[in-house]
Amino acid sequence: AVTVTTMLVRIPIPASQGYLNFGDIMIMLVAVLFGPLVGGFAGGVGSALADVIGYPSWALFTLVIKGTEGVIVGWFSKGTTNYGRILLGTVLGGIVMVLGYVSVAYVLYGPGGAVAEFYNDIVQAVSGIIIGGGLGYILKKRIGPILE
């Protein structure tokens, strides 16, 4: 699901040789519902597969960055329907994702690549927090006992 969501909308970012996508929505949704192991696997492997198909130079970085994002979101969300805790997890996961990609873009492509990456990653993080985290919270309140 993460791979498909990531590939559905891909807007290239020439300065960083990456792309804007909405895979973070699915990463955060899965991590909220299923916890850190599934969230980390879905985030890392699902997103890296999308990169292998379209942007292979980013695949290894994506495996680590998006995997960490999923683990963080899942860890904060595991065993709770507390909105504040889920929100904190999605925000921290989003921050880690943005900082991870901006750092890699800076090393590989310099300040211009990092700036281009920053703005696009902010859009991805915010969409993931609002849509993925919000939907995850709503679903978990309704069907949480089935998933845990």
Curated annotation (Swiss-Prot):
Transmembrane stretches, start-end: none
Positions in coiled-coil regions: none
InterPro entries: ECF_substrate-spec-like (IPR009825)
Pfam families: ECF-ribofla_trS (PF07155)
Gene Ontology terms: cellular component: membrane
Protein name in the entry: Uncharacterized protein in gap 3'region
Taxonomic lineage: Archaea, Methanobacteriati, Methanobacteriota, Thermococci, Thermococcales
